[in-house]
């Protein structure tokens, strides 16, 4: 399912226009992104939790030259599914 299909599904489920569904989806993704940037977690009870994970610095290798290099530590967005979502699958 891509974004436009999700918007259509939201519009049908909530009995609203596609434009309203798109605004709602955009507002939701913006709110989650903003919270994660601030280091917060976003928990939707039953659905799951969005949080920021930390990837440690590690050694890698340049595939072209074989030369070792250091890959910097990074923050990555993560999602942990909630019980209701797991049970639905």
Swiss-Prot record:
CDD domains named in the record: HU (cd13831)
> InterPro entries attached here?
Hist_DNA-bd, Histone-like_DNA-bd_CS, IHF-like_DNA-bd_dom_sf
Q: List GO molecular-function terms, semicolon-separated.
A: DNA binding; structural constituent of chromatin
Q: Which domain of life is it from?
A: Bacteria
Would the keyword DNA-binding turn up in this protein's UniProt record?
yes
Swiss-Prot/TrEMBL keywords:
DNA condensation, DNA-binding
Gene Ontology biological process terms from the UniProt entry: chromosome condensation
GO CC terms of this entry? cytosol
- A Pfam match: Bac_DNA_binding
Activity modulation: Activity is regulated by the DNA mimic protein DMP12. Activity is inhibited in the presence of the DNA mimic protein DMP19, which interacts with HU and prevents the binding of HU to DNA.
Which parts form a coiled-coil structure per UniProt?
A: none
This protein's assembly is summarised as:
Homodimer. The dimer interacts with the DNA mimic protein DMP12. It also interacts with the monomeric form of the DNA mimic protein DMP19 with 1:1 stoichiometry.
The record's family statement is: Belongs to the bacterial histone-like protein family.
Biological function: Histone-like DNA-binding protein which is capable of wrapping DNA to stabilize it, and thus to prevent its denaturation under extreme environmental conditions.
PANTHER family per the record?
Answer: DNA-BINDING PROTEIN HU, DNA-BINDING PROTEIN HU-BETA
Q: What is this protein called?
A: DNA-binding protein HU
Which organism encodes this protein? Answer: Neisseria meningitidis serogroup B (strain ATCC BAA-335 / MC58)
């Amino acid at each position: 399912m891509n974004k436009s299909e999700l918007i259509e599904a939201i519009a049908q489920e909530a009995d609203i226009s596609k434009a309203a569904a798109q605004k709602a989806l955009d507002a939701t993704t913006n709110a989650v992104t903003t919270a994660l940037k601030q280091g917060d977690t976003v928990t939707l009870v039953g659905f799951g939790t969005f949080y920021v994970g930390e990837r440690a610095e590690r050694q890698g290798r340049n595939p072209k030259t074989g030369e070792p290099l250091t890959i910097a530590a990074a923050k990555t967005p993560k999602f942990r599914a909630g019980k209701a979502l797991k049970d639905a699958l």
